[in-house]
């Protein structure tokens, strides 16, 4: 590459800011400006450079203003608020030469804004992302809630460890068909599926998996992070094939079930423990805990027998209930 071309390419990709670097490239021609958000804040000085070998006859416009903002190959602006963000375009002779989109990431009292996603407050405050795994294969699902329904974009990236990252691939975030109601308000639910590239289900985990969701709403940028071991987000599927078998000369029945198809194998190593409960219309019997896949219970008319599972050796989340009717 010719030295002059190298200089042009370098300047076309870089925005110059104040000595504290508060501007970075999210993707090609999209830049994040980090701002301290308080009254009379000075903002950030941003220098935009037109991606062209031309030197003369260049003018600048913004989608936030109908006026010509300046002329020349560079444009210096002061970014203080959302009215200063948006798309900037350099022109010559009526032709658009290049565009740069500025998004704002605001910080108030030293804390980055979290306006886009709903705080689910479980298992602790500031829990914006929730993730679960059905087994130890390295596949997991994450989801989040938002009240916003338009002008919204998400991207997800993940890795195991930061010093020596191992690949975790995440798909595109998808909007669930059903809304989620929380505190008498409806939210949109987004989910994403992720898979660790190389994993040994039986190996002890030493490096945390980190998931980062980048959210853009109009001209606002935010990011949200969750870190975990797979073992800490395990939630098996419910037991399958529940069956009731009457016992001779007894008011009891034998309820039996099988491991869910999605659970890790061999089951002799990846073992589950189970909780069994008879649930009537107005009463729930005492829960029974066991490692085997059958139990004897007293099954009343109009009652259900329900069973749930969790990892036997590590205190994972309990699965949802599987149930079978006594009648």
UniProtKB/Swiss-Prot annotation:
Glycosylation site list: 223
GO molecular function: cytokine activity; cytokine receptor activity
Residue span, Ig-like C2-type domain: 23-106
PROSITE patterns, alphabetized: FN3, HEMATOPO_REC_L_F3, IG_LIKE
Domain Fibronectin type-III: start-end pairs: 238-327
Annotated signal peptide: 1-22
GO CC terms: extracellular space; membrane
SMART domains: IGc2
Protein keywords: Cytokine, Disulfide bond, Glycoprotein, Immunoglobulin domain, Signal
Disulfide bond annotation, renumbered to this chain: 50-90
The protein's assembly and partners: Heterodimer with IL12A; disulfide-linked. The heterodimer is known as interleukin IL-12. Heterodimer with IL23A; disulfide-linked. The heterodimer is known as interleukin IL-23. Also secreted as a monomer. Interacts with NBR1; this interaction promotes IL-12 secretion.
Family of this protein: Belongs to the IL-12B family.
UniProt function note: Cytokine that can act as a growth factor for activated T and NK cells, enhance the lytic activity of NK/lymphokine-activated killer cells, and stimulate the production of IFN-gamma by resting PBMC. Associates with IL23A to form the IL-23 interleukin, a heterodimeric cytokine which functions in innate and adaptive immunity. IL-23 may constitute with IL-17 an acute response to infection in peripheral tissues. IL-23 binds to a heterodimeric receptor complex composed of IL12RB1 and IL23R, activates the Jak-Stat signaling cascade, stimulates memory rather than naive T-cells and promotes production of pro-inflammatory cytokines. IL-23 induces autoimmune inflammation and thus may be responsible for autoimmune inflammatory diseases and may be important for tumorigenesis.
Protein name, as recorded: Interleukin-12 subunit beta
Upper taxonomic lineage: Eukaryota, Metazoa, Chordata, Craniata, Vertebrata
